[in-house]
């Protein structure tokens, strides 16, 4: 995967992380994505109308600043976006704050603001292995005419000690 990580032919990826009342896990999930070994990606966190401190924690941890964004309405069922934020310290991090509408609506909002041809969706309690995106994108590079989607393997770490991670 090392050659793939340095290749100019690797597709850029938009990682979409939807979060509704995820104050306990969202920071760790964001850190996990940001530590990926991948040449070019953006992370779009969609705060789906959380009533806890999810958005406030993100704003504090990643120095979010309100940003005007142009929203393509390529997917109509994306709900009402209240605001978008960019990190002052992490250029590939964008946060969308929207009214609660459920996971599919949150992901649609993320797709509408994404910049890249491939996207990956994850939950706010997920952690990635360092090469997860490289492994996921590889089939697209090997057979772009036939591959339209890939999936990952989910492993439960409840009660386990994570040595490398957020």
What are these regions (language model features)?
Residues 29, 74-113, 135:
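Glycine-rich, basic loop-to-helix element that forms the pyrophosphate-binding segment
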Residues 1-9:
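N-terminal membrane-anchoring/stem segments of glycan-assembly enzymes
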Residues 11-14, 42:
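Cell-envelope/extracellular polymer assembly enzymes that use nucleotide-activated donors
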Residues 123-127:
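The conserved acidic donor/metal-binding loop of glycosyltransferases
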Residues 31-40, 60-68:
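Short, acidic, metal-binding catalytic loop of nucleotide-sugar glycosyltransferases
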Residues 131-166:
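Conserved donor NDP-sugar-binding/catalytic core segment of glycosyltransferases
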Residues 119:
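Short aromatic/hydrophobic "clamp" motif used to bind/position activated sugar donors
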Residues 47-67:
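A conserved acidic beta->alpha catalytic loop
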